[in-house]
Each structure stands twice: as structure tokens, then as C-alpha cells.
Amino acid sequence: MMIYISGAISNNPNYQSEFQKAEQWLMLKDYTPVNPARFITNLPKLTEEQIMKIDYCLLELCDGIFMLGGWQKSKGACAELSYAKSLDKKVLYQKYYERGQDNE
């Protein structure tokens, strides 16, 4: 199952580390993580609108979305969650998984 990782990137100096930790955790749980932070780093300077178009395309390919802690503070992460729900994607929240719960 492919899972898109969503969380705050702008104004978050630790985003690379947070996304990588989520990626590793998802792999341990036998998910195939899709880490948009890896793509952003390797792309030329893009507008926020261009980045969101890429993110939506990646999200469409996935079976679900994994919401990192603090996602509510990110306009982009909120938009990704809304889009994922409109596509009936499975939604996983980091805070529940940290407590050992397996679902929303």
C-alpha cells in the first residue's frame, strides 16, 4: 500500500528529518512511503501552486495519506488532506500511531 506523507514544510527547519523518520516508520510497517520532501529538494525553484500540483499527482497514485504531527498549521498539508478525503484515500495520523493505535 502506497502512503503519501503530509506535513508542514514551509517554516519548519526540521521537515527533512521529520519526513525521513515517517518514511522509515512506514517502511517498517510494510507500507511503501511517498515522501514529497525528497522531490522538492531536487527540483528547481517552483511556485507554491506548482508544488501543490505535483503533490496532488503523487497523492492520486497513493492508497492513503499519513499526516505528520503539526499538519494543522500547514496550509498545504490541510489542502492535501482535503484532497485525499475527496478521493476516498485512507487517512493515517501520526499521533495515533505513536500511541500504538492502528487507525484514525
State each model region's role.
Residues 1-104:
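Conserved catalytic or regulatory cores that recognize and/or transform ribose-phosphate-containing ligands
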